[in-house]
């Protein structure tokens, strides 16, 4: 975890200060690719090769998947490092999977892998908790889930965008596109960000308010900083210290301390969940 945080600090500055030549993207996807490859090549599993495959048949490793969207077929695609009874591992390199799940519309250009164009998880899968629950059920159909921990990126204050329309009519967009394309692009980015934050919370509410008691019974947790994060933009890599301070303060709240205690107990003994069903 410490390595991941350190790598992100270095990567974020380089990636989010780049500029894209693509009018539909904010940042240069080539810089993102280069930085992901560097992380892979310098990792323990990379062995100095940036093109190591996502698939790993070793049974002692954690099973990992990320979510992307197939632009043509639509819907979420799970890019797995492992095979299941119904699907093979995703046939691509680690850096390609990283690019696919990072290709957020308006921020990075999509990536084509084996003639399929992938973007990020889209506004419906930026919170992939349901995907994770479904995946666990597919792999271990007869086992109870011990614990689910969902980690958010902060809650947005909707009033911060009150002076800007969150949706434009087609006529208004056409007019702006021909008179001020930069402004319409900025509004598109704002719309996307609001949809992402809204969809993430919708998934959380669906799970917490309507849990399947055969799967989740007091073992679902969501950690999400409620205030302050909404003012920090994706490109503001230089505000990581602010994010850390806000998160540390949030994690010390009494309610969160109690949640941490419960999570620690379940992580130490996941069988507690099975016995409680």
Language-model regions, residue ranges each:
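Conserved catalytic cores and adjacent C-terminal regulatory segments
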Residues: 1-277
């Amino acid at each position: 975890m410490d390595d991941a945080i350190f790598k992100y600090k270095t990567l974020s500055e380089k990636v989010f200060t780049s500029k894209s030549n693509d009018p539909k993207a904010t940042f240069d996807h080539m810089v993102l690719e280069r930085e992901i490859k560097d992380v892979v090549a310098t990792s323990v599993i990379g062995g100095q090769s940036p093109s190591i495959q996502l698939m790993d048949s070793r049974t002692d490793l954690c099973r990992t998947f990320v979510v992307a969207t197939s632009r043509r077929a639509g819907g979420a695609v799970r890019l797995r490092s492992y095979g299941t009874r119904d699907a093979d591992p995703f046939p691509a390199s680690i850096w390609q999977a990283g690019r696919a799940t990072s290709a957020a519309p308006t921020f990075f250009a999509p990536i084509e892998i084996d003639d399929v164009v992938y973007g990020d998880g889209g506004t419906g899968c930026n919170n992939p908790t349901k995907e994770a629950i479904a995946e666990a059920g597919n792999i271990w159909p007869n086992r109870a889930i011990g614990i689910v921990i969902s980690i958010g990126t902060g809650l947005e204050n909707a009033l911060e965008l009150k002076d800007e329309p969150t949706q434009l009519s087609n006529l208004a967009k056409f007019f702006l596109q021909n008179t001020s394309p930069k402004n319409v692009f900025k509004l598109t980015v704002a719309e996307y960000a609001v949809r992402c934050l809204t969809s993430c919370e919708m998934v959380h509410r669906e799970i917490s308010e309507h849990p399947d008691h055969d799967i989740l019974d007091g073992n679902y947790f969501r950690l999400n900083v409620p205030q302050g994060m909404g003012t920090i933009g994706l490109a503001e890599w230089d505000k990581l210290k602010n994010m850390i301070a806000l998160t540390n303060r949030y994690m010390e709240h009494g309610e969160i301390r109690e949640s941490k205690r419960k999570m620690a107990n379940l992580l130490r003994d996941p069988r507690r969940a099975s016995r409680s069903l």
